[in-house]
Amino acid sequence: MTLGPIMLDVVGTELTQEDIRRIRHPLVGGVILFARNFESPAQLKALTDSIHAVRQPPLLIAVDHEGGRVQRFREGFTRIPPMREFGKIWDEHPRKARQLAEEAGWIIAAELRAHGIDFSFTPVLDMDYGESQVIGDRAFHGDRQAINELAFSLMQGLKRGGMAAVGKHFPGHGYVVADSHVAIPVDERDFDQIASTDMQTFRQLIDDGIQAIMPAHVIYPKVDNKPAGFSERWLQKVLRQRLGFNGVIFSDDLSMEGAGVVGDVTQRALAALNAGCDMVLLCNQPDKADELLANLKWDIQAQSLARLARMHGGRHPSSMVALHEDPDFMHAVHRVGQVGKADGDLPFA
């Protein structure tokens, strides 16, 4: 059975029969995990093993594990600071900031891969304009050069740990105040303004080989009246053709308020897939998941399957014990653990 175009969540810390029924459906290609799915490192590894055992090829398993306030697994995992902290260091010590960002990426990937997670939806490539609370300290900086350097470093660290990177939220979510989880944000800038600022960070990371991108549930009415994640203009004409992106396009969560302008859950999924998404996410609404699985008609294209296959995690440590026996890894954990503390404590070794 090939991977399908839908990524769903599961209810709790172990699979229920309803979970298994859903993720066995041929339209499903992945599972996204949340904090409610985590009790302990051992339980998490058992859960991912059970998810991977349901299908061949195994389903993709993903998580939002950016650091700061968006880190789903905490006990037994290294606390990763918000990305803004690396930006603060970059202002004074760019080389050290790049080194620390790369180490943070390595830690994120290695720890998640040791627990059977294929990838995290990270890094955030949005610019920090100081207005968006939902982005806020999740962004590296307000300066494009800082974002480019730090995001590239984080991506290199993820790669070292066996994990692909997912840049978000194309073409930029940082300029709008509204939170697309609960509202429909509108960015009134014209295309040239966006292309010369926010979009440049995506262009650079695409040139650097980023493997996946997630578009924003933001409407840019001077470009298209649909949110970017449902816009063929943004995804095909700009992202694919103009920027030359050949990786995976993941929709943001179809249950978010910012997706509501498109219609019901099936209409949302169809709109995203037709616009150019390879895989759509639907989270926290099992009844809507059942509705989508019952009603969506979609034959996934060979090109999408090839892209998605590259999101499976690479080589990884057999366990956290093995990681903790690696002195280089533990030194990285110590250095990243100092980020965000008083300047005098920064690990400038």
UniProtKB/Swiss-Prot annotation:
GO terms assigned for molecular function: beta-N-acetylhexosaminidase activity
Reaction equation(s) it catalyzes: Hydrolysis of terminal non-reducing N-acetyl-D-hexosamine residues in N-acetyl-beta-D-hexosaminides
InterPro entries assigned: Beta_hexosaminidase_bac (IPR022956), Glyco_hydro_3_AS (IPR019800), Glyco_hydro_3_N (IPR001764), Glyco_hydro_3_N_sf (IPR036962), Glycoside_hydrolase_SF (IPR017853), NagZ_Beta-hexosaminidase (IPR050226)
Catalytic residues (UniProt): H181 (proton donor/acceptor), D252 (nucleophile)
A biological process term (GO) from this entry: peptidoglycan turnover
EC number: 3.2.1.52
Subcellular location: Cytoplasm
Residues marked Important for catalytic activity (site): D179
Associated pathway: Cell wall biogenesis; peptidoglycan recycling
Residues that, per the record, bind substrate: D64, R72, R138, K168, H169
Keyword terms of this UniProt record: Cell cycle, Cell division, Cell shape, Cell wall biogenesis/degradation, Cytoplasm, Glycosidase, Hydrolase, Peptidoglycan synthesis
Principal location listed in the UniProt entry: cytoplasm
Function: Plays a role in peptidoglycan recycling by cleaving the terminal beta-1,4-linked N-acetylglucosamine (GlcNAc) from peptide-linked peptidoglycan fragments, giving rise to free GlcNAc, anhydro-N-acetylmuramic acid and anhydro-N-acetylmuramic acid-linked peptides.
Family under the similarity heading: Belongs to the glycosyl hydrolase 3 family. NagZ subfamily.
Protein's UniProt name: Beta-hexosaminidase
Organism of this sequence: Methylobacillus flagellatus (strain ATCC 51484 / DSM 6875 / VKM B-1610 / KT)
Source organism phylogeny: Bacteria, Pseudomonadati, Pseudomonadota, Betaproteobacteria, Nitrosomonadales
Gene from which the chain derives: nagZ
